[in-house]
Regions:
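Long, Lys/Arg- and hydrophobic-enriched amphipathic alpha-helices
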Residues: 214-241
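Active-site histidine-anchored catalytic micro-motif
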Residues: 1-201, 217-222
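Structural signature of cysteine-dependent C-C bond-forming condensing enzymes
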Residues: 203-213
């Protein structure tokens, strides 16, 4: 079963050549230090017009890494769930090519039945995970397998539980993570904060020595009066020390 690239052509380009040129151009603007040891990135999930360049700033630091698995977490916007949901798809479409889903890893994560399985129509109606996949494909092509995790409204106990399930993959040097977030509107609100909390808890439980850095920050609008609002976007990376 394949998950279609439902937002290609609207939230980001639908043609493979345009996607490749856009991402490679953005990557070319990012200064990196050879092959880096990146464990994960936190990137925006808005349309590329608003935040694609900012997302590229973090993803670019994964260039050249020897990776077998990418775990992507993103928030639910379109429907309500109190669980983390895994994909039912076995393949994931992008404009440039198709990923295989790491069904073995998903089964291992869900060995205790703590995850739900997302209905395809709900998953294809959610942009937060899909919009990151072309960056992953540009970095690694179809040599990597992908785990898709849609994060719902989970409580503190659940965050601990999901973080614990991710620890073996956090320790695996050939697994990297991508997290979709942005700072939503004006004020202290983050769309995707549950994803970030699970990630940070898993990092802490793993015992890895890491460094978290803000790579780039941007805004949809420069607020000049109290009547205006703005959406802010941030790209971060976690490096192994």
């Amino acid at each position: 079963m394949i998950r279609r690239a439902a937002f290609a052509g609207s939230w980001y380009p639908g043609k493979a050549s345009v996607v490749k040129d856009r991402i490679s151009g953005w990557f070319h603007e990012v200064a990196t230090n050879g092959v880096e040891k990146v464990k994960g990135v936190i990137v925006p999930h808005a349309g590329w017009t608003y935040s694609g360049r900012i997302a590229a700033e973090a993803f670019a630091h994964m260039r050249g890494m020897d990776v077998e698995r990418v775990i992507v977490l993103g928030p639910c916007h379109r429907y309500y769930t109190t669980k983390c949901m895994l994909t039912q798809a076995t393949q994931l479409q992008t404009p440039a090519g198709v990923f295989e889903v790491d069904t073995e890893a998903q089964a291992n994560l869900n060995k205790d039945g703590i995850y739900g399985m997302c209905r395809m129509r709900d998953e294809e109606n959610e942009h937060s995970l899909e919009i990151e996949l072309p960056f992953v494909y540009e970095l690694f092509g179809d040599k990597v397998k992908v785990v898709m995790m849609m994060v719902g409204c989970v409580n503190t106990k659940q965050k601990e539980m999901y973080a614990e399930s991710l620890v073996p993959y956090m320790k695996d040097p050939k697994t990297v993570f991508g997290f979709a977030e942005y700072i939503e509107e004006t004020g202290n609100t983050i769309c995707g904060h549950n994803c970030i909390e699970i990630y940070l808890r898993a990092l802490a439980k793993s015992g890895l020595s890491v460094k978290n850095e803000v790579m780039m920050y941007g805004q949809s609008n420069r607020v000049e009066s109290f009547d205006e609002t703005s959406v802010s976007y941030c790209a971060m990376r976690t490096s192994i020390e």
